[in-house]
Amino acid sequence: GGAFRTIFSCGVMDAFLEKNIMPDYIIGVSAGAAYGVSYASRQPGRNLKIILDYCDDKRYMGINNLLNPKNKCYYGLDFAYDTIPNKLVPFDYDEFDKYHGEFYAVVTNVLTGEPEYMKYTTADRNNLILKATCALPILFPNIYINDTPYLDGGLSDSIPYEKAFEDGCDRVVVVLTREPGYKKSTTSSTKAMARAYHRYPNIAIDLVKRAGRYNHSLKKLRRLEKEGKVIVIRPDSTEGFSRLERDKEKILNMYDEGYAKGIDISGKVAEFFAK
């Protein structure tokens, strides 16, 4: 996840495509899932094109969308999840169908506060699952799937490597969008957001507990990395790079760093998966 910081992950994935590295299981959360589908559909450069072409387009994101009573989201929902993938920068549904593995997106059940892991398929042409995994509190309305409201998967499971192991993976590559040593903290704005969700107490709890869970997850990840069970790829620094970054030079630099790291580690990853 990490909104536009995920352009780092896009660089890594494009490098892996170049080196023909494709795992048989992919799980993503928030933007990690929304951009990850283009990895499974083998469309290098697609995510970068979308961000560069539309990051400063009001139809894509902006306060006007949030204030629109028919949209109620910082992103233009129809534009981002229908017009772009189905018309402007087409998503290759046929190629995704050829993907030999399984692709999951993490969503958070608004009523229980628990993570749910939804399998993405091309039957979901409205991209409901991708909307739900990206649905940040306040910036998105609740996204309903089968009459159940959902929000961003990062609220309940920010780094879903444990689910990968539970589902039978024995070797996992984790791509993070924060630098080594990063620790998440509970800010005053997060506490205010939690109060705003008083009608959904389990979401309020998720918001308050998220930083602690995230940091605990990182600690466990470090141990697994030392044990050789995971490979972790992350940027050197995200300082000065906003979640909703619009500076195209910064975006390109972050993508290039991800691509370079992906190329550098591709041999190790290929060997890791071949064990």
Model-identified regions with their sequence ranges:
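Patatin-like phospholipase
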Residues: 1-29, 37-275
